[in-house]
Amino acid sequence: MKGLSGSRSHHHGITCESACDSLSHHSDHKPYLLSPVDHHPADHPYYTQRNSFQAECVGPFSDPLASSTFPRRHYTSQQELKDESALVPRTLATKANRLPTNLLDQFERQLPLSRDGYHTLQYKRTAVEHRSDSPGRIRHLVHSVQKLFTKSHSLEGASKGGVNGGKASPDGSQTVRYGKRSKSKERRSEPKARSNASNASPTSPSWWSSDDNLDGDMCLYHTPSGVMTMGRCPDRSVSQYFMGAYNTISEQAVKASRSNNDVKCSTCANLPVTLDAPLLKKSAWSSTLTVSRAREVYQKASVNMDQAVVKSEACQQERSCQYLQVPQDEWTGYTPRGKDDEIPCRRMRSGSYIKAMGDEDSGDSDTSPKPSPKVAARRESYLKATQPSLTELTTLKISNEHSPKLQIRSHSYLRAVSEVSINRSLDSLDPAGLLTSPKFRSRNESYMRAMSTISQVSEMEVNGQFESVCESVFSELESQAVEALDLPMPGCFRMRSHSYVRAIEKGCSQDDECVSLRSSSPPRTTTTVRTIQSSTGVIKLSSAVEVSSCITTYKKTPPPVPPRTTTKPFISITAQSSTESAQDAYMDGQGQRGDMISQSGLSNSTESLDSMKALTAAIEAANAQIHGPASQHMGSNAAAVTTTTTIATVTTEDRKKDFKKNRCLSIGIQVDDAEESEKMAESKTSSKFQSVGVQVEEEKCFRRFTRSNSVTTAVQADLDFHDNLENSLESIEDNSCPGPMARQFSRDASTSTVSIQGSGNHYHACAADDDFDTDFDPSILPPPDPWIDSITEDPLEAVQRSVCHRDGHWFLKLLQAERDRMEGWCKQMEREERENNLPEDILGKIRTAVGSAQLLMAQKFYQFRELCEENLNPNAHPRPTSQDLAGFWDMLQLSIENISMKFDELHQLKANNWKQMDPLDKKERRAPPPVPKKPAKGPAPLIRERSLESSQRQEARKRLMAAKRAASVRQNSATESAESIEIYIPEAQTRL
């Protein structure tokens, strides 16, 4: 027996005695809680502890067992069992038999804690890796376990006899232990053979191999990180790597490495330096802090966290929360020795354990980490919900360039990510894609940005985060991390909100196609981030955001990166309230002159688009989608502009046709890559959507933006996007299209959230398409009659016009449109005058309207044209600003309204066959046909008419001033919409 113990100690290499000493000291520790300073984790490998227990600490351990509430928590618990069995056999053989039954559970629990390092068990773990998820296999495992238990009982009886013989000696105690161990299923058989071998050669892992397996269990149990990584024993010899990593005993880990060739230094978090590729392979546990497999995965994924740092941190954290934090189920999951190996029946019974067993196969590939049973179970359920497969983690190809930070991040995030619903298999994750693609965006924009800047995050930062995450991961759900790792389906996984969005879009099938495409091409590691935006502003459903990357997000601690400081590869579209959209865009737009597509246009809205890149990509995608193949040939910028509105004028005739087909209050647009856009566009152009859903799939970015109709409608109403787009196209070319157009681009085009014309007054945009070139449809701007109608909407439109397009080009186009329209009216009225024998009063009206229009065009229009030209001339000394132009244009609007009302009246008379209006109208609005009898009445009606016009003008001016004030207020506030909502609404409520 002593030889056996000696061999064991040898096997451990010197650590045994120290372990024994420490064990003896620790025998007093009844709780199995190990503080980081505890000798058990740090000083003793689990197996060394066993040695000490067996040889020297038999008595003390038995005591703690009785006292300890959770014997499994005690290092001594197993010893106690063993000691008890040793003692009991002398006293009562039957009692010994009972002990197995009574203490079997505890013993099982304790075994991992004891960490005798049964390599076989650890190796079994490897075997477990190959186990399939099939219930049959699980059943088989359970059955085998039961057999093993039965067998262990019989063996236990035999061992008891041995124990009786050797009980007095520590060796005897060891022997008893051996019997106990064998009791744990396969351990018995293996330990026996091994014990013999060990007697022959102390260094041989025979006895120890079985112990090591137990140790593997224990180490698994001890090391939450290992558990989190689903520590698979990559190799039987690796079983002890845990001991090193978990115990953080580099020395003992190295010594133990004798039994574990690989374990050598790698097992110790402290010794990560010694990790070799092979070591990593087998003892990747300790080195990567993930299961060796996991670690390999990470290495492949360049997720190789700073091994030393990670290991040390993980070890320390593990030590701090080691044993208690990993549930029994989990450690058993790790330790599954193999189908025949000891897998506590009780644990196996647990569904989570079985699930874990089933899931472990997912980790079979070398690169896939092996989840603990609980982790696996969680992962499984999660997978069922999400279907993403991270099992391809094995193929996870995050380039090393991402640096350990990323690895750490990915590792630490795994759990959070899994919760976030990592869709993407890590393999699909492209480091560049992860960092750069908007998909990588996480729950909230800021977080996404932070994620996008993961590479930017300092390693220190990442490590700190990793530690915190690891703690949370270890304590809360190592399994989730594993889940993230093992998620089986690489395809993008859609959340419920997504389905909602799809329904909204009415593009479900299309969305599915996109999804299938994405899943089929994992390289598009776009986490599908979908934001649903409400009209009140951007309300992101973080739940809607899916991050499909192993490296995705912290669930709890978002990276410290400030939201806007980082590169903003991701598009986050904010639905701006209608009130907000025009003015804030205008403010942004002014600064944004050349950068219509730049994000600044939207910066005001809290959720404004994050990045030009995303915007442009989205714009292109939206462009392709909206315009279909026809628009694709357009320049990406121009296309983006046109895409900004569903009604945006099509730069091509095709687009006009498409728009006419599509005229809807709102359009759901799904934008995909150019390749897909053609197909998608074709189907979408024909379809009408009541709610706006935009799905943008950038190269690797797949997003859906949903705008509430009210928001988009208001926005659309605010801006005649068609004109805006047309002008914006030119302005983009000129790089001088600040104002709402810019915002339009930044928000709508760039976000590829196609703004939808929700409001009826924007029907012009669609209606006038035919009249003008695709580049610009002046008639859309202020339709002749609509101007009269628009008086009610004038404040809004005026504000929007003033706000939206402050560029000289824009105003010139507006001016030209007005001029063309007025000239058309004048020509029509003159023709009517010639062709018809009209009463004098009607002729007078016609002449008045025509004269006023001509005068306005000759004077004010001319002046305004000069102002616009000066605005466009950078050398003009008193160069008017876009605001000046907007103000002057607003003044023109008053005159235009008056004239448009006159022509409107003429049109009504024409519709009435040039007959006077109803008598009431005659009395109110004008004198009856001139009659010499009552010359006095002529002037009175004129006065009344003038008074009506003047009152209307005053009202229009008031509205205009109010609109201007509102616009200025919005300009002054970066969060105009938010403020207006938060401040004004409360006031209204108070009043109510």
From Swiss-Prot:
Its main location: membrane. A motif (PDZ-binding) lies at residues 990-992. The modification Phosphoserine is found at residues 169, 362, 365, 368, 372, 389, 418, 421, 425, 428, 437, 509, 516, 578, 581, 605, 608, 611, 947. It is found in: Cell membrane; Postsynaptic density; Synapse. The keyword Cell division does not apply. GO terms for cellular component: glutamatergic synapse; plasma membrane; postsynaptic density; postsynaptic density, intracellular component; postsynaptic membrane; postsynaptic specialization; synapse. This is Disks large-associated protein 1. It comes from Rattus norvegicus.
